């Protein structure tokens, strides 16, 4: 989406990820309140549209989240479902409202609680009309096949994949919002329980509860609200895959490649300009594949990019500086929103103990959603100041 007028992030909020005994609406409100406070918004009537992303917690989740904030009854509240990209999609739509002049202030929220709502044995299954689901395919199995093929084609080892968990846990060491953090060795990752070979338990994200929220506004409102360090949204792009099940290159992701290409073209920012990236590292192999798909390195050089230390502090681009999904866990509808919230905090130098230096000027987030190829959606966003 090419932005018709400038859009700025005024404030962000997020909750700690993990297991929560409070429901999704409490988590969503906590993140929203933090974002509203950071935006100097003290009256609910100042917000002109709201989008709430959620994956599994039922109907009218947005109204449930926002009713106790005084937002019901005076603004449109739109509920967004897009599997794992729901939170990112909610913020994309809030950005669109401001970009098109439909609102001067809008909020996007992603929230989820699986602890209180998990349907045992059926969680996250795609529709049984999906040919891959009918034959027993699940996400972990699909990514395991991608890992096996990638290792066969490139010579990558189990230790290479484990390096990503080690890196991301190290990034999250001092992050109070992360669920899993602290030093872990390559040996501990490789020797943890096998889930779907070659992926072990420590190479798969945990299914978590949590929330994230982002308030966006026009340039005029930035001045009225007195935002000291507004973050400009340089671009925000959503693409969906075609409906087919034909053979494909499972070591790539053409939807992500197309989304990233469109984002760079519309924003005028190239991958070489990006300082930090939060991507969809639901599994170690996913992060490795997305290095190339997002253009962080040339095709065929993702493994070299990792081995050379280019995805961590002191490298070309710090990938998953908050610790990624491998450290936060993955609350389906909330992850995309939390990625953006964490990136904005990095750009505002608000991450003591895990701050990227020098302070990032350009950040990119990437989240995917869907089961089979036909239902996949990709969301990528570039922000700068």
Swiss-Prot record:
Q: What do we know about what induces or represses this protein's expression? A: Induced by toluene.
The catalytic site is made up of 84
| Broad enzyme group | transferase
Q: In which pathway does it act?
A: Xenobiotic degradation; toluene degradation
Pfam families per record: Thiolase_C_1, Thiolase_N
Q: Sum up the protein's function in the record's words.
A: Component of the BbsAB thiolase complex, which catalyzes the thiolytic cleavage of (S)-2-benzoylsuccinyl-CoA to succinyl-CoA and benzoyl-CoA, the final step of anaerobic toluene metabolism.
**Family assignment from sequence similarity:** Belongs to the thiolase-like superfamily. Thiolase family.
The entry's protein name is: Benzoylsuccinyl-CoA thiolase subunit BbsB
Organism of origin is Thauera aromatica
Gene that codes for this?
bbsB
